[in-house]
Amino acid sequence: MYSNSNAFLGGANSLRPGQQPQQQQQQYGAPSPFGQQGPMQPQPTGFAPQPTGFAPQPTGFGQQQTGYGQQQQQPLQQQFTGYPGLQAPQQQPQLQQQFTGFQPQATGFQPQVTGFQPQATGFQPQAPQQQPFQTGMPPVPAIPQQFQQQQSFQQQQQQQQQPSIQQPQPTGFPSVQIQAPAQQPAPTAQGGIAPPPPVKPQATGFSEMAASFQTAGGKGRRAEQKTNTVKIPNIRLSFITAHDQARFETLFKSAVGEGQTTMSGEKARDLLLRSKLDGDSLSQIWTLADTTRSGQLHFPEFALAMYLCNLKITGKALPSVLPDHIKNEVSSMVDIINFSITDDAGSSSAPASNAPSFATQQNTAAVPTIQQPQPQPSNSAILQAQMTGFPAQQTGFMGQNQGLQPQQTGFPGMNPQPTGYAGPMPPMPPMPTGFGSNLSPNAGPGGMVAPLNSQPTGMPGQWGLVNTPATGLPLIDALQARMMPQLGREQRNYTTAGLQGNAVIPWAITKDEKTRYDALFRAWDGLNKGFIAGDAAIEIFGQSGLDKPDLERIWTLADNGNKGRLDLDEFAVAMHLIYRKLNGYPIPNQLPPELVPPSARNLSASIGMVKNMLHQESELRKNTGASLLPQKTGVSYLKGHSFKNTGANRKDATVFKNNDEEVGYRSSARRRVGTSPRPESPAASNSGDDLTIEQLRKKIKEKQVLLDAMDFNDEKNMEEDDILDRRDRREADELYRRIRRIQEDIDNHPDAQLMSADSDAERRALKRQLQQLTDRIPELASQVRKTEKAIADARLELFRLKDAKAHPNSAAAIVGTGPGGMVTESDRIKARAKAMMQQRTAALMGKKIDIGDDDADGPKRLEEENIKIKTEKENNERMVRDVEDSVREFAKGIEDSLKEGAPDSTSEHEKRRWEDALGVEDEVRDFIFDLQRESRAARIRSQDRQGGRKATQEPVKAEAPVSTRVETPSPSISRTSTPASTAGGGSYSSYKTPEERAAFIKQQAEQRMAERLAALGLKAPGKPGETAAQRAERERAERAEKRRQAEEEDARREAERQAKLAEEEGGPAPVASPKADSRPPPPPPSRKAGKADDRRDEEAAAKKAEEERLEREREEQERETRELEESAKAQEDELAKERAEADARLKALEEQVRLGKLKKEEEKRKKKAAMAEAKEKEAQLAARRAEIEAARKREEELRKQLEAIDDEDSSSSDEEGPEQITPQASTPTVGGSQVGTHEQEPNSPPPPAPASVASPPQIVTTSPNAERESRNPYFKMMSQSSEASTSSVAAPVASPPPPADVSTNPFHRMTQAAAAPAAAVSSAVSGAVSGISDAISGVMPSRRRPNDDDDDDWGSEKGSDDEDSDDEGRPGGNSAAALASILFGTMAPPRPLSATGEKPTASTPPVVSSPSSPPPPPAPVEPSAGSPPPPPPPPPGPPPAPSGGAPPPPPPPPPMPESGAPAAPPPPPPPGPPPAPGAVPPPPPPPPGGAPAPSLPAGRPAGLLGEIQAGRALKKTQTKDKSQAAVAGRVLD
C-alpha cells in the first residue's frame, strides 16, 4: 500500500523532516523520494536500443513500466539513492544523454505526469538541481522543456489545493540543501512559495547525516571522505562527558589520519606530552590506557588516556587499576572497532552522542514555506497502479508492498491512494481528522495494535508502574492527541498552550499513562521495528512545545546507553518526563529508580560481571597453567548444562590429545580381507634373501662396530655418572658435616637450654596474661574516674566550708543544680528571691537581717573554685585517657609481636618435615634422627658438666632471673665468652688452609671425647694450656660449690625438721644456724697424663669461663639463700619468744583461774552459811553435786584441749601461729571479738597490745587447726575470744611478765599495730583484763575495791549486751541464772556480785562468752546458782568458771563448764587442753575480755566487735549476768 519507506519514522516519502534516508534504505531497502523517477532513469539505460519498440508502451503502460522497472530492473539503485555521496558526479553526462534518448517516453509519460500532478510539482525544482543532486543520489533524468510549463502549472494548482501537504515534502529531498548558488533561482518558479534562503533550516530534518552538506557540495564530499576514513562506534563512554568525547574524537581523527583506526605510540606520546605531566605519571597513564598492550591506542583507549591526564592535572590520584566498568566499556568499544562493527547512522557533526539535535526544530515549524511540495502519495499510487498493469509482477510487488504497509501506518490517508490514481488529495483530509480510525485499518492486517495495547497491563510492578492517582491525569488526553502523527504538523509552531497544568504526578509511570504512551509508540513505529530513532523523536517531542534544552535533557535521561533510539519503555519514560514538565515538575538530573526500565537496570553491571568472570578465568588458566592441564592430566573442563544427563557419552574436546605416532591412513589395513592378519612388508620379508655372504659379513661387522661404539658410549656415560655421583656424595657429606657442626654449635651455646621450652605454650600464656592485664584497664580507669569525681566533690565542699568560715557574713552559698554542681543563672535568681523573701519576712516581723558585704563575691568565688576544680578534673581525665590509649597501643604492639612469631602452616610443614623427618628419603631421615640423638646427648653432657647446679637451682628457681641480671654487668662474661665460642668450634669455614682445618677437626674430636668421658663418669684429661695452679683452683672452686650446695640443702632440711618438732612440742622452733664447713674438701682427682697440651689449654679456657659464670651464679644464689635463712631465723626467734611468752601467760592464767575458783568457792560457802533455810542447803548440795560432775567433765575437756593445743602448736604455720594463740576451748566464748581480729590476721596476726598488756594472742599457734577447721563458722570467733581472754587475764595477774616486744615478730611488723592508738589499746586491754578477773574471781572481786574497775568494765559490757540482747534469742527468764552458772560455774550470787560493778568501761566489749553454744543451758544454770553453797573441790571449780563460754544446749546447769569447753571452738577442734591456750579462758568470760583485745587493733569498742562477730548467747548471757550481778551485788554488800 505504501511505496516508500516508513512514513511514520520520517522517511523520504513522509511529510516530516528529519528521517535519514540512509537508515531507511539500509533497513528496508526502500526507494528514496525520487524512487520512481530514479528507477525510470535506469530503465532508459537498460532499454536504450528499444525506445522505438517501447514507444507504444509508455503511453499505455508508462506508469506500469516505470513501476516495473523500479521493482525489477534496478532495485539496488533505489537503495543507494538514500546515500547522498555514493554516486560519482561522472554520471551526469550519462544521465543527460539518457534523457535525450527517452524523450519519446517522456511524451508517453506525459499522462502520468498530469495524472500525478503532485509528483511533477515535486520535481519541478529538481531540473536545475540535478547537477549537485547527483552527488547525493542516483542520476535523475531531466524533464524536457516542453513539460516545464505544464509541471509548473500543475505545481501551482497543487499548491493551491494542498499547501499543507506540499510544503513539508521537501524534507524528503536532502539534496535540495546542496543547491549551488547558480541553481537557487530555480525554486522561484514555484511562484515564490519556497524562497532559496529558507532552505538552510531544512538541515534539522537530517541533523545526523546532512550536517556535512550545510554549506556546499564540496564540503559535503569532504565530510563524506572524512567519515569514511575513521569510523568510530557511536557509543557513549560513561566516564567522560559527551562534549569531551566529541572533542577527543575530533582530536583523534585529526591525529590518526585517513585509513587508520589506531593512534601510534609516537603520536600518542606527542599528544600526552602536551599535558606537561611528569614522566612517571604519563608512563602510568599509558599502562592503564593501553588495554590491548599493542603499543597503539584505539579511540576509547585514547579517550581514557585523556581522561586520566585530566584527573592528574586536577590533582587527583591515578588509580592503580582501572575500575571494572571503565575497563569493560573500553574493551567493548575496542572489540567493536576491531571487528569493524560501526554505526554509520551516527556520522554527524556531533558523533560522540546519539541524542538527536533539537537545534532547529522550532525554526522548521515556524517557516513552512521553506519546504517544497512533493506529492509522494501519488508516487505510491503510481506504484500500485503499475502493479495492476502487471498482474504477475504485481503479485510479487504486492508482497513487498504489504511488507512495507506497517510503515505506512503513520499515513492512514494513503490507504485509498493505491486504489485511485488521481486521488492523493481526497484521502488526505481524513488523516488529520482522526488518526485512530485510520490506524486501525492499517494495523488490522498486521494484527499488532490490539495485543500490544493490552500488554502494559501485565507490566505493572516490574519497574515502578503504579495505579492512577485519585486526582486522575488531567490533560493526558490532550497530550496524546497532540503527539499522534497527523498531516500538516510540520507547519505548526507548537507551544505548551493547552498542555500545561498543575496535576499531582508520581515519579513512577501510572498504568493509564503507560497504555497511552505505548499506543503513541506503536503509532509512530509503523514498521514494528521496536524503537523510534532520534530524528523521529525530534518531531514527536517537539509537538509538546517544550524548549530545546529541556528536550535534550529528557532525551539524555531516557536514552539509556546512548543508543540514539528509544525502545518502548524508554519512550514511555521520555513521555512521562515531558508530561511531568508540562505540569510544572522539574526535570531530574538523574533518572530516579522508579523510572529505570528493567531492560537497562542491571544490564551494564551484569555485562561487566560476566566480563570480569571470563577475564579472571582466562588469567587463572594462563597463570596457573590450567590451560595445559587437559593434555597432562586428562581433567575435563567440559561444562555440563543439564541437571539430568550426565554427558558421559558426549565427546569432550577439552581432554583431547593428538597422538603423533598414530598414522591416519594405512593402505594395507584398508585392503585386508576379513580378519586376516596384516601381511608382512615385502621389504622386511625379502630384505635378507637377496644378500650374499660377503654382504652379510659386512653387515655383521658394521653391526659389531656399532655395538662396540655403543658399549664405549655406555662405559663413558657410566664413568661420567660415577664421577657425578662421587661429587654429589662429597657435597652431600660436606653438607652433613656442616649441619652437624652447626647443630653442635647450637647445643654448645649457653642459651641452648631455652630451646627445649615450648614457645607456643609460652606465647599463649603471655597472650592470656596480656589479655588479663588489658581487661583490667577499663576497671582501673573507672576507679580512677570515680576517685577523681569524689575528690572534686570533696574539694568543692571543702571550699564551701572554708569560704563560709572565712566570710561568716557572706550570704549563704548558692547550691548549684547545673551539671557537676555548677551554679546556673536560675540558681542565682532563686537565691536572690529567697534573700528578698527573708528580708520581707524580717521586716514584717520586726527583725533585722544582716546582709553580708560580699554577697556577690561569694558565688563568684565558688564559681571560680568550681571552674578550677573542673578544669583540673578535665586535665586528669585527659591524662587518664592518654594513659588508656597508650596502654592499649602498647598492648596492641605486644600482641602483634606475639602474633608475628606464631607458626603458620608453611613453617609447621617445614618443621614436621625437617624435625620429624616426615616425607624425606631414608638416608635423610636417618641423618635427622642421628642429629636429634646427638643433640640430646650433648644436652645431657652439658648438664653433667654443670654438676649439681641444676638441682640447687630448682629450689630457688624464682630467683633465677635475678641472678641473670646480676651476671650481665660483669665484664668477665664477655671476656670469657670469646674463648668459649672459639672453643665451640662453630667457625670451621674461618680456617682457610688444610692444616688449620685439620687442627680444628682434631680439636673438636678431642673435645667430644672429653665430653663423652665426663658423661661416663671418667675424668677427662687436663685442658691444653692449663697450668697446675689453674687446674687446682678450678677444682677447688668446684668442690667448694658442691660443698656449699650440700650444706645449704642440709641446713634447710634441718631447719624444717626442727620447726616441725617445735610445733609438735609446742615450744619455739629452734632457729637453724648455718653449719661451719667441717668437711674437708675432697682430694683433687688424680690428673691423667697423655693428652696433648693444646687440647688441655682450650678445654681449660672454656671450662674456666664456664666456671666463672657458674661461680657468679652460685654466689648470687648463696647470697639470696643467706638472706632467706636470716629472715627465717628471725621469724623463728620471734616465734620462740612468742611461744615462751604464751607459755608464761598460760601459766599465769591457769594460776589466776585456780585462785578465782577458790575465791568463788569461798563466796559460795559464805552465801550458803548466810542462808539458814534447808531449801537453800538442798540447792547448794545439788549444785555441789552438779559442780563435781561438771568439774570432772571440765578436767577431761581441759586435757583434751591441752592435747589439741599441743597438736595445734606442732602443726601451726609460722604465719598463722601468732594469730590464733588462745586455745580453741576458750575461743567459743568470744566469737564476735575474734572475728574482728581474724580479719586483721593477715596483716598483723598478733594484736598490737600496749606496753601494759603483753601480747596474749601469741600463746599457741593454732593455724593448723584453723586451716583444718576453716569451714567451721565459729572458728574465727573462738580463736579471737581466746586471744582476748588471755590478754585480758594476763594484765590483772602480775605473775605473767608482759612480753618484751611483740614487734620482733615479722608478722607483727606486717600487722596494723600502729593503727590503734596506745591509749585505746590500753583501755581496751584493761577492760578485758578486768572482765576476765571478774569472771574468774566471781563475786569475790566485786566485793573488793580493787575489782571495782573490773566490775565497771563488766557492767559496761552488760550494758552493751543489753542493747544487743535482742539479737541473741536466748530465753530471758533464765538468762541471769544461766549467765551466772556459765561465767562462774557456781551459785548465781557470785555472778551478780561480779557484775555489781556497773561502771561502764568503754574499752571492754560485752562479754560474749557463749557464741556458739545454744541457749538451753541457762535454765539449768539457775538451780546451779542456788546450789553454790556446797564448795566444790578446786578442780571442779575451775571448770565451772569456764562455763562462761556458752555451753552446748544439752548440758544442764552443770554442763555450763562443759559448754564452756565445747563452746570454745566447734566441738572437735576447739577442745584445747585448759592449760595451753587458756582453755584458760575456759571461763568464757575471758573471751569477752579477749573481745576487746581484738578490737584494740581496730580501735573500735570491743562491745561492737562482740555484737558483730560474737554469738548471740554471749550477749544474752552478759545481759543476764548484769541484772543478776546488780541485784546480788547489792545484797552482798
From Swiss-Prot:
It holds the Pfam family DUF1720. Residues 277-312, 546-581 form the EF-hand domain. It is a peripheral membrane protein. Residues 649-664, 894-916, 935-947, 1031-1063, 1090-1164, 1173-1203 have a biased composition (Basic and acidic residues). Residues 1204-1218, 1348-1367 have a biased composition (Acidic residues). The keyword Cytoplasm applies. GO terms for molecular function: actin binding; calcium ion binding. Residues 690-890, 1026-1209 form a coiled coil. InterPro entries: DUF1720 (IPR013182), EF-hand-dom_pair (IPR011992), EF_hand_dom (IPR002048), EH_dom (IPR000261). The keyword Coiled coil applies. Residues 1500-1517 form the WH2 domain. Residues 360-378, 393-410, 1221-1237 have a biased composition (Polar residues). Residues 19-46, 53-136, 143-170, 177-193, 345-359, 968-982, 1279-1293 have a biased composition (Low complexity). GO terms for biological process: endocytosis; endosomal transport. It is found in: Cell membrane; Endosome membrane; Cytoplasm, Cytoskeleton, Actin patch. PANTHER family: EH DOMAIN, GH06923P. Component of the PAN1 actin cytoskeleton-regulatory complex. Component of the PAN1 actin cytoskeleton-regulatory complex required for the internalization of endosomes during actin-coupled endocytosis. The complex links the site of endocytosis to the cell membrane-associated actin cytoskeleton. Mediates uptake of external molecules and vacuolar degradation of plasma membrane proteins. Plays a role in the proper organization of the cell membrane-associated actin cytoskeleton and promotes its destabilization. This is Actin cytoskeleton-regulatory complex protein pan-1. The lineage of its organism: Eukaryota, Fungi, Dikarya, Ascomycota, Pezizomycotina.
